[in-house]
Regions:
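Glycine-rich FAD pyrophosphate-binding loop
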Residues: 7-11, 20-46
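Redox-cofactor binding/interface segments in oxidoreductases and associated redox assembly factors
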Residues: 9, 148-149, 272
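N-terminal Rossmann-fold NAD(P) dinucleotide-binding loop
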Residues: 15-16
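Predominantly flavin-linked oxidoreductase catalytic cores and closely associated redox partners
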Residues: 21, 108-246
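Conserved N-terminal glycine-rich FAD pyrophosphate-binding loop of Rossmann-like flavoproteins
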Residues: 39-62
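A conserved beta-strand/loop capping segment in the N-terminal third of enzymes
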Residues: 56-106
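FAD/FMN-dependent oxidoreductases across multiple families
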Residues: 124, 225-300
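C-terminal helical "tail/cap" subdomain of flavin- and related membrane-associated enzymes
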Residues: 302-389
Length: 389
């Protein structure tokens, strides 16, 4: 048995970001903590791999260059239920492979002296008098606080925080070599979003992202929808693959745990970050949000360490009162607007106004701090055309 001031379960972007952000605030505390990973890096990870500018900025602010292979996207093609719209803007997204990005973030942790212990899946979580005991095949770890960064099916969430699974979306994806398809997005540094799913009662979209796998140009093609989706989502992806001339590739389905306002994100001595807490319900994006969760959790860990209060309220309130909490609530509202009855008004507005699209993208991508601004700032930018300020 070993004792640590903090155990982080999971070494994806949320877990490593929490450790790295903690190191920026209190290096000694971060080096005394431990990050547990059930697999060994680089490990397979099912994800479209879209890293938005906010995520790249987070990495740079923490001294980590985006050195893994990636495709930079400068153009978007969006098909709405009515028409298709093109939008050009520099650095809209960086499409990475999660096995490579996650391994790079783990390397960054280790370079700072943070312990990441691989092939240690959590077998048991037991509350003790003054903390939580985490049991793995290699041993036990006692800590006053455990942070669950262990994804959509989080063991920490189910056993210590909240066993509910009502806010789970579904995604299916496939990787297809560009050669032999009819898709020109890779050559044009473009990603595509297709919202025609709404015509069939599905609340979500289809996507095609340019990516590189072992140096070979590929398309990551997928479908995302809030529940219920089921067979219609599979059928929609099949039709999209045929439309792009992508054949019948192997597909992988995966759950996405999305953020629901008011959901429990913490319990006594157990907090959640990243997918375990909840990602963007509108698009299912989680990488950059995972990093931002890490900043807030790290600051709360330092505060808890000083006060001795590891209760749920400290972290829950810190998150809800932060700009990230506000962004997640707005994304939840946007889900209702774009995937509900009001979609017939929202999509036409975006189709007609490039200025509105630019503001929306900059807000979503976190460019120039847009995601931390008030709604009045957006209105002023739309009226004055001062979007880049």
């Amino acid at each position: 048995m070993s004792r640590h001031p903090l155990v982080i379960v999971g070494s994806g972007p949320a877990g490593t970001a929490t450790a790295l952000a903690l190191h920026a605030l209190d290096p000694a505390l971060a080096r005394d903590a431990v990050v547990l990973e059930k697999a060994r890096h680089p490990r397979p990870k099912v994800c479209a791999g879209g890293l938005i500018p906010a995520g790249k900025r987070w990495m740079e602010e923490h001294g980590i260059a985006l050195s893994v292979p990636h495709v930079t996207v400068h153009r978007a093609q969006v098909t709405t239920p009515r028409t298709t719209v093109a939008h050009d803007e520099r650095d809209l997204c960086y499409v990475i492979r999660r096995n490579e990005l996650d391994a790079a973030l783990v390397d960054a942790c280790r370079a700072r002296g943070i312990a990441v212990r691989e092939q240690e899946p959590v077998q048991a979580l037991t509350r003790t008098g003054d903390g939580v005991r985490v049991s793995t095949p290699a041993g036990t770890y006692d800590a006053p606080l455990v942070i669950g960064a262990d994804g959509a099916g989080s063991v920490v969430r189910r056993r210590l925080v909240d066993g509910g699974r009502d806010n789970i979306a579904r995604a299916i994806m496939a990787d297809v070599p560009v050669a032999g398809t009819r898709w020109d997005g890779y050559a044009n540094a473009r990603y595509d979003f297709d919202f025609r799913l709404l015509r069939h009662g599905l609340r979500g979209y289809l996507w095609a992202f340019p990516c590189t796998i072992a140096g070979v140009p590929h398309i990551n093609i997928g479908a995302y929808a809030l529940a219920p989706s089921g067979a219609p989502l599979d059928d929609a992806l099949s039709a999209y693959l045929h439309e792009l001339g992508a054949g019948v590739p192997k597909r992988v389905a995966f759950p996405i745990h999305w953020y629901r306002p008011g959901a429990r994100l913490a319990a006594e001595r157990a907090w959640l970050v990243g997918d375990a807490a909840g990602v963007d319900p509108l698009m299912g994006e989680g990488i950059s949000l995972a990093m931002e969760y890490g900043d807030i959790a790290a600051a709360a860990v330092v505060a808890a360490r000083r006060s001795g209060d590891y209760g749920a309220a400290l972290y829950q309130q810190a998150l809800e009162q932060s700009w990230l909490g506000a962004k997640l609530r707005r994304l939840h509202l946007a889900t209702r607007l774009f995937y509900g009855p009001t979609s017939r008004f929202c999509f036409p507005l975006a189709e007609r106004s490039r200025r509105l699209r630019a503001v929306g993208l900059r807000w979503y991508n976190g460019v120039d701090g847009w995601d931390r601004r008030s709604g009045w700032s957006a209105v002023a930018a739309l009226l004055t055309n001062r979007i880049g300020a």
